[in-house]
Regions:
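A short, proline-enriched helix->beta-strand linker immediately N-terminal to the Walker B motif
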Residues: 77-81
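C-terminal boundary and immediately downstream tail of ABC-type ATPase nucleotide-binding domains
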Residues: 49, 151-178
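Helical segment within the ABC ATPase nucleotide-binding domain
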Residues: 98-111
Length: 197
């Protein structure tokens, strides 16, 4: 299970490597040395920087995207048949989301693990899922292959979700102005660098 908020899921007093390997060691799946070596493999597969040493850091010493990938490594450590990602990119900026999703997809494929992505983010759904199941109030509304679901949903509720995605933004040309300023002066210390722009 990979939670929505990685920061809230880690103990700040323990190093990342200890937390990544704790369940694997505790349940006798691997000995400590083997579990640590495997964690380094997982860190590398998830494109974490300096995979042999990043585990020596504490949670507050890595970025949110890195922490999300460490949590994925922790969930993948015992090599589960199924992993659940619960809103895995909600707390991340768009650029970091792309990196994290790419890493998650790669590791799930590499280790032949089934994955369930729980999300409200249609971009995540389109990028990650082979099959989409739409729920409303805990009940299934519709299920279909991703391409089919995105192209032609059958149920009204699903159509309403997709229509939000399809709203067209007002188009602008390169010559359209979004702001106009006149008479701007600027100085750097006592030196004027702009005058009446």
């Amino acid at each position: 299970y990979v939670a929505q908020s990685a920061a809230a899921s880690f103990n700040p007093a323990h190093r990342l490597i200890e937390q990544t390997t704790s369940s694997t060691i505790r349940f006798g799946i691997k000995e400590k040395a083997e579990a640590h070596k495997d964690a380094h493999v997982l860190y590398a597969a998830l494109n974490l920087p300096d995979p042999t040493n990043i585990g020596d850091r504490y949670p507050h010493q890595v970025s949110g995207g890195q922490l999300q990938r460490v949590m994925t490594a922790m969930a993948m450590s015992p090599r589960p048949d199924l992993i659940i990602f619960d809103e895995p990119t909600t707390a991340l900026d768009v650029t970091t989301q792309v990196e994290v999703l790419s890493s998650m997809r790669a590791i799930v494929e590499e280790f032949n693990t089934a994955a369930i992505y729980i999300t409200h983010d249609l971009a995540v759904v389109a990028q990650m899922a082979d099959v989409i199941k739409v729920l409303r109030y805990g009940e299934e509304v519709e299920e279909a292959a991703t391409r089919q679901m995105l192209k032609s949903p059958k149920q009204d509720y699903t159509k309403s979700l997709w229509s939000v995605r399809a709203l067209q933004k007002e188009e602008h040309t390169a010559t359209d102005s979004i702001m106009s300023l006149r008479g701007i002066d600027a100085a750097y210390g006592t030196a004027k660098v702009l005058f009446d722009v």
